[in-house]
Amino acid sequence: EIAQCLVGSEMCIRDSPEAVMSQGFFLSLYILKGRKDTMTKIRTRFAPSPTGRMHVGNLRTALYAYLIAKHEGGDFILRIEDTDQERYVEGAVDIIYRTMAGTGLIHDEGPDKDKGYGPYVQSERQASGLYLKYAQQLIEQGDAYYCFCGPEELESMKRVVAGKEISIYDKRCLRLSKEEVQRRLDAGEPHVIRFNMPTEGTTTFHDVIYGDITVNNEEMEDLILIKSDGYPTYNFANVIDDHLMGITHVVRGNEYLSSAPKYNRIYEAFGWEIPVYVHCPLITNEEHQKLSKRSGHSSYEDLLDQGFVTEAIVNFVALLGWSPQDNREIFSLPELVEAFDYHHISKSPAVFDITKLRWMNGEYIKKMDPEEFYEKALPYMKEVLKRDYDFRKIAGMVQTRIETFPDIPALIDFFEEVPEYDSAMYCHKKMKTNEETSLAVLKEVLPVLEAQEDYTNDPLFASLSAFVKEKGYKNGYVMWPLRTAVSGKQMTPAGATEIMEIIGKEETLKRVKAAIEKLS
């Protein structure tokens, strides 16, 4: 009855007043109303470290966290984790903001949007003494302790298990008396604060993707909570911040699976609710090795530099470990929000298939607004075309024929100058052409080209079509050698007359005459 009361208060008050009063209904309802939003609203976070360009794996984490929140109408929080001062890179915070804005992953809260859970930068939170306060609470509870061991002592604790060197701290500082600890603290001895892990039994944690995972407690080291420089460790700061910010779902790479039981122990020591864990599969290259900087496309910025468009990158990254029920592949960001179900994330490593990304990028380029495409393509066209061409027409030719923008120069460089080419290119089985027939056709068509005044595509094509009809030839029998002569390429972004319109009459005649000489 009480469960029903909390769902439908008016009905409950009317139908069962005794149950209402006996169970303290009004107090329960007041608490429920006050906590309704925080109890029901999904809150995810992206907490990058400002250490340089954004790795594809981090972008996927941000995207999945965003999609999980937005699919359920929840909040997506940006938090900057800059507690590792040694790895901090100047300007990296700007890269984070630029990447988030560029990909459309707009945060609801963050350093620039404080909604009452700030500060959202860990170094600022650390400066307030926040993490130390919670670490000291654990010390008072007996769940943490000061450790004064130096590098030499820690080195002596290492041992080899199954051919692998491991280090399990032996808790020697846990046995220090309170007086001894205080004396050493007063003397200013360097120290850390460690969590007091149980040494017997097991710890089980649940992950949405990987299910229940159980580890022996004896395998879990007394992890450091506060480092000797006073900064919290990544693990500890995460737990504190996620709890205080009301994070309901934690999305991260599966390399953190081994840390999850330690996280749970900290949550339990504080008596806090454990969030939903969503660990994403590893991203590998085509050789099934971890995607690294050496691959040349491990970061979002790398991909932009290589001519990939943001929408294609986001679409592709979404499919690195997740697939929709209908096997569809092209999604806008709003469509991803609608379709994304994190329960369908795979356990298996996701392969970064650059060929598939190129294909997908080509699909987005085809759909791009022609004016937007022209603006993006112009710098690539001007790399190889130095004369005054109709660049808009050339852009129209290549838009449906490229996969990335850097494909453009090699596709159009012949407009500037015919490359050296093998005369065997005139041989085409389907067009029934060879070097001899091509030479004859070019000699026959040259007077037609010389007499033609209007070199725009339609009139030019009409004149050549009339020539073809008059001679009783097939279209390709004439157009193949003509296109080869004016381009010197097997593959071109347009037909012979379209190319001739771009280069003009004078250049066309020059190239056809050169081809006749080459074939003679």
Residue ranges and their predicted role:
Residues 55, 65, 96, 138, ...:
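Residue-level signal for inorganic ion chemistry
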Residues 120, 226-227, 245-257, 284-316, ...:
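Conserved phosphate-binding loops in nucleotide/dinucleotide-binding enzymes
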Residues 1-15:
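Single conserved hydrophobic/aromatic residue that forms the stacking wall/gate
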Residues 458-519:
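Charged substrate- and nucleic-acid-binding regions of tRNA-handling and nucleotidyl-transfer enzymes
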Residues 370-471:
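Small-residue-rich helix-loop
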Residues 39-162, 260-272:
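N-terminal Rossmann-like or analogous alpha/beta NTP/dinucleotide-binding catalytic cores
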Residues 17-27, 482:
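Short, often N-terminal, low-complexity regions
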Residues 140, 145-279, 285-291, 324:
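Active-site cores that bind ATP or allylic diphosphates and position pyrophosphate for catalysis
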